[in-house]
């Protein structure tokens, strides 16, 4: 069974008025909306993800003294007794739950409502970063994505949305590691970076995890 996963098509990422606008993200609205309705694709299920942060989320630069957005930051494991760390990035405040910025863009939300499409939220625990729609960066806390896919007998996932080098990539890798046949549809994604080398590296990482990377 095939499931389409639409990643983070939210105002803060897609609208020019958003706080963390992905370049050319608006270009995806109509194509992804059409893709969700494409009968030839034979989607068994569609899942839409959202960043859904509390205002004090650890990934927001404003919540750290003397830190600016896009600066590097060392995340420490939230698990007591675990001294592991991960290097990451601090972001502008974005997708604070129940605000305009966290809302799905209208065309996607309309389909969610009319077709009763599943929404999976991530990033709602204050003390940890998330990119994958399956779990936090530590793989400690799990969202309900995998349980939903298993419940509906999914064995194949197709992933679209933003941003390619962050949440799309992480979600695809998680899906592949969980045993799903995974495909990223590049024409239906957009990266934050405009560096071709960054995009090439993402493609290589995806392919190294046996993920299909195709245009459409």
From Swiss-Prot:
One of its GO terms (cellular component) is nucleus. Induction: Induced during the stationary phase of growth, by calorie restriction, by various hyperosmotic shocks or by low-intensity stress (at protein level). Inhibited by N-ethylmaleimide, HgCl(2) and PCMB. Competitively inhibited by NAD, NMN and 3-acetylpyridine. Transmembrane segments: none annotated. Keywords: Cytoplasm, Hydrolase, Metal-binding, Nucleus, Peroxisome, Pyridine nucleotide biosynthesis, Zinc. Zn(2+) binds at residues 51, 53, 94. GO terms for molecular function: metal ion binding; nicotinamidase activity. It is found in: Cytoplasm; Nucleus; Peroxisome. Optimum pH is 6.5-7.5. It is an enzyme of class 3 (hydrolase). It comes from the Eukaryota. The keyword GTP-binding does not apply. It catalyses: nicotinamide + H2O = nicotinate + NH4(+). Belongs to the isochorismatase family. Has a cis-peptide bond at 162-Val-Ala-163. Present with 7720 molecules/cell in log phase SD medium. This is Nicotinamidase. The gene is PNC1.
